[in-house]
């Protein structure tokens, strides 16, 4: 299974501001959807909650939300408590490519642990 990171980065290397995207570009959002469609996506809880409620969970994708909060529940999502646990779950489901979609702490952990096989950067 390929473990991919997908991120939109500003010229100053910023990936977000106050738990939101820096910009909302239709073509970038379309690209994100096309690339991640029908795959497992892994996101941190804060990043997930920053997605407008009407778009949650992201459709036609298996949404895996990472949280330390053992009582956290979100309808339509798989809740995991570690990045390894989330990746293992996707692998057990015979996923071919899992996407780490943020936020910053999740990206940092995946990169520090040398887990990333492929990066999609816009």
What would you call each of these model-derived segments?
Residues 1-5:
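Extreme N-terminal starter segment of soluble prokaryotic enzymes
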